[in-house]
UniProtKB/Swiss-Prot annotation:
InterPro entries, per database record: Ribosomal_bS20, Ribosomal_bS20_sf
CC annotations in GO: cytosol; small ribosomal subunit
Statement: the UniProt record of this protein carries the keyword Disulfide bond: no
Function, as annotated: Binds directly to 16S ribosomal RNA.
Protein name: Small ribosomal subunit protein bS20
Keyword rRNA-binding: yes
Endpoints of the signal sequence: none
Keywords: Ribonucleoprotein, Ribosomal protein, RNA-binding, rRNA-binding
Organism whose genome encodes this protein: Streptococcus sanguinis (strain SK36)
Molecular function terms, GO-annotated: small ribosomal subunit rRNA binding; structural constituent of ribosome
Source superkingdom: Bacteria
GO biological process entries: translation
Length: 78
């Protein structure tokens, strides 16, 4: 455990940010799985939006976001 006051605060913030980021990534994964289970235009838009939000927040790399959206788009086109 940290001894310096600022380090203690940063450790607490790290825990909060980790929870927030984990929840955001989980929501993204859930949206993708929902689309894969039942491909539809509405679920595609929701999954695509969730991927874009995760990319904007820096949770996933822009290339991964692009790759994921391309794969979902290909499944929708089938």
């Amino acid at each position: 455990m940290a001894n310096i006051k600022s380090a203690i605060k940063r450790a607490e913030l790290n825990v909060k940010h980790n929870e927030k980021n984990s929840a955001q990534k989980s929501a993204m994964r859930t949206a993708i799985k929902a689309f894969e289970a039942n491909p539809s235009e509405e679920l595609f838009r929701a999954a695509s939006s969730a991927i874009d939000k995760a990319e904007t927040k820096g949770l996933i790399h822009k290339n991964k976001a692009s790759r994921d959206k391309a794969r979902l788009s290909a499944k929708l086109a089938k």
